[in-house]
A protein has these predicted regions:
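Non-catalytic terminal/interface segments that mediate subunit docking, oligomerization
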Residues: 192-217
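Positively charged, amphipathic and often flexible ligand-engagement surfaces
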Residues: 1-197
Length: 217
């Protein structure tokens, strides 16, 4: 949810320092842990969307912001064919950006774009022993094993092409909102027995400042 303000901040920083920075746009990798973190800490709300189509729309909105940011060189990390097609449509003749994919995934999607069309694609490959890679592999299993994952749906023969490539905006409108009713908000985690205790998100600079001010009083 905070991605668009971060993009605006990064672009402003580039203007202030007369530098162009590459910004990587990614989604989904830490979704489960972010949900659990917010519930355990009793935060006022989730820092991300609880419906997959809402995340897809947010990603595209951020992609558009990055194309319009003069001091940002976009790097789009995705295996979603609809997202890739949308980005290519918006880019037009602009080639000053790159795609990114995980090692072992997305070869078929990006092979033609790289070899025949000349687009850039960076491959993210894990390095290290099995102990170092275990957390990475678990995140990939959670991400790609989810029913809402594009990679998972692509392998599901029961899902039609039209359904796979449906407009995420239309999906949100069809379900009536961006919040998933089956995912309890942090305050409602223990309902109906009781309300969850309210935590303080010290990662939020504004909340940290307010907390420090109250302590000083």
């Amino acid at each position: 949810k905070r991605a668009r303000p971060v993009i605006a901040w990064a672009n402003a920083l580039g203007h202030d320092t007369s530098r162009i920075m590459q910004v990587r746009l990614v989604k989904g990798a830490y979704w489960d842990s972010e949900i659990k973190h917010a519930q355990e800490r009793g935060l006022t709300d989730f820092p991300l969307f609880t419906r997959k189509p809402a995340t897809d729309v947010s990603y595209l909105a951020c992609a558009k912001d990055m194309f319009e940011a003069a001091k940002i060189r976009p790097a789009f990390a995705t295996h979603n064919a609809l997202t890739v097609a949308t980005i290519l449509q918006w880019a037009g003749d602009n080639r000053d950006f790159e795609f990114q994919r995980l090692h072992g995934m997305g070869e078929g999607l990006f092979e033609r774009l790289v070899r025949e069309e000349g687009y850039q694609c960076r491959t993210y490959a894990p390095v290290g022993g099995h102990r170092d890679l275990l957390a990475y592999l678990v995140r990939r299993l959670l991400e790609n094993g989810a029913n809402s994952s594009f990679v998972h749906q692509l392998a599901d023969q029961s899902i039609s092409e039209d359904e796979l490539l449906a407009d995420p905006v239309e999906k949100i409108m069809a379900v009536g909102g961006t919040r998933h009713p089956a995912i309890a908000a942090p305050a409602d985690l223990f309902q109906p027995e009781r309300t969850n205790s309210l935590g303080v998100d010290l990662d939020d600079a504004l909340i940290l400042k307010e907390t420090a001010t109250e302590i000083a009083l």
